[in-house]
Amino acid sequence: MANILAIDTSTDTCSVSIGKENEVFSFHENIPRQHTEKLFSIIADLLEESKLSYEELDAVAVGTGPGSYTGIRLSCAVAQGILFSQSIKGISLSSLELLSIEANKESPSSTFVAISQENLGNVYIAESSFSDGDIKSKFRLISSDLFKREGFPEDCHFVGEGCALFPEVINVLPGAIPKSKYLLEIAKKRLNKSELIEPEEILPVYLNDENSWKKIK
């Protein structure tokens, strides 16, 4: 069975999980502005609790944002460092996809639309569907003024902070925060199917200079 480390620090909440065989060891706490200081010690504590070492990891999964500039750069850099040092591969998911995964467990639907917080009049959107336990998504950045409910499937469910901007949509999971345990579930499936990526392919989606959503290339 696989040993996987999953990390999401895209919000004020630091969420880290380790999957070992059929066990899950998790840390999920709101620690604003403390991610850089505490992330490595949190990982070390979970490795100790799970009786694993870095050398025994088969993959590292990371939530790549959008979200906190510092948080997602940190999680991606840490994931890359571990992957390079252990000569293993990784899995990445948008942090918006993690919201849809949780929402699908609470209120199943064929399609989910996760909407980010607004930045300079724009929102980042992930439109996701599920098949064989995995998630497939289309991403787009649009002006809040151009958002139309009619542009999405009639039976879709909405989730994310950005839902509050649009009275015509109902947030099916208010207050949802990306959770690494859901990232772990997808990571296991992709590892089993050998759908992994190289360390250098783990790229954050972040607020560039706090002015615009930008994906590093």
Language-model-detected regions and their locations in the chain:
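Stable alpha-helical structural segments in soluble proteins, enriched in small hydrophobic residues
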Residues: 46-50, 85, 103, 180-191
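N-terminal beta-alpha supersecondary unit
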Residues: 1-64
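Surface "functional belts" at beta-alpha junctions
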Residues: 22, 31-34, 89-178, 206, ...
